[in-house]
């Protein structure tokens, strides 16, 4: 209990600038943790959805039937299902045109799927740049608070008749808390950014591989 009181006493006794730095780092840390948990849920759902759709796609069923099933679930599907939905819809539309060139039909479907893939990339990478920024800047913000606090401590020595450790220790301790809070905000953000960036890259590779495989299937169907 005394340690907790001492900790909060140091924070309450810090200078206004150091307190503002601590408040900023605490706020950033809370926002960062919120985004970490949200991104974890989003990426986990995206992996599960991709697994389920691939099972349905490669089950050997009719593509038109699969398209109707996907569209019945959502007119604007996301993930791998969204890429399939966009591509097959464009393929069917272009193929109905009189005198449609099979190559042009497939290329049109590929362009639409590339656009859908780009949208999925943007959605998957949402908030990752924020985590990267938190991870790279928080230690420096904390260091700024530490330097400011130490400057105040040594400034106080200038007006003292006798310099003692007891006089500067509280100021240095409260200043170092800012550095600790900066690291507390930065370390989880860096770990999450590296982990989620890897997860996003693997998902995008899966989407891209599916796009190429689906394009090959459409090429065969276009010449039927």
Where are the language model's segments positioned?
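Alpha-helical transmembrane segments of multi-pass membrane proteins
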Residues: 25-28, 190, 194
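Hydrophobic membrane-targeting segments
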Residues: 1-55
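Alpha-helical transmembrane segments of multi-pass inner-membrane proteins
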Residues: 23-24, 169, 177, 181
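Hydrophobic alpha-helical transmembrane segments of polytopic membrane proteins
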Residues: 175-191
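Predominantly long cytosolic amphipathic alpha-helical stalk/bundle segments
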Residues: 48-141, 150-164, 191-224
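Hydrophobic alpha-helical transmembrane segments and adjacent short intramembrane/lumenal linkers
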Residues: 161-175
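Residue-level signal for the membrane-embedded core of alpha-helical transmembrane segments
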Residues: 21-31, 138-141, 145-148, 183
């Amino acid at each position: 209990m005394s340690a907790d009181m001492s900790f909060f006493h140091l924070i309450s006794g810090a200078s206004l600038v150091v307190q503002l730095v601590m408040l900023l780092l605490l706020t950033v840390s809370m926002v960062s943790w919120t985004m970490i948990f949200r991104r974890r849920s989003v990426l986990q759902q995206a992996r599960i959805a991709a697994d389920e759709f691939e099972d349905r796609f490669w089950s050997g069923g009719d593509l038109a039937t699969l398209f109707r099933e996907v569209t019945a679930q959502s007119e604007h599907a996301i993930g791998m299902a969204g890429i399939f939905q966009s591509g097959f819809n464009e393929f069917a539309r272009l193929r109905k045109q009189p005198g449609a060139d099979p190559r042009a039909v497939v290329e049109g479907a590929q362009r639409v799927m590339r656009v859908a893939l780009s949208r999925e990339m943007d959605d998957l990478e949402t908030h990752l740049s924020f985590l990267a920024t938190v991870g790279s800047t928080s230690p420096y913000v904390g260091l700024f608070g530490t330097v400011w606090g130490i400057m105040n401590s040594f400034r106080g020595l200038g007006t003292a008749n006798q310099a003692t450790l007891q006089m500067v220790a509280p100021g240095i301790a409260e200043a170092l808390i800012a550095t600790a809070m900066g690291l507390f905000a930065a370390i989880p953000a860096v770990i999450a950014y590296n982990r989620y960036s890897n997860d996003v890259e693997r998902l995008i590779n899966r989407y891209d591989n599916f796009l190429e495989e689906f394009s090959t299937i459409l090429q065969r169907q276009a010449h039927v």
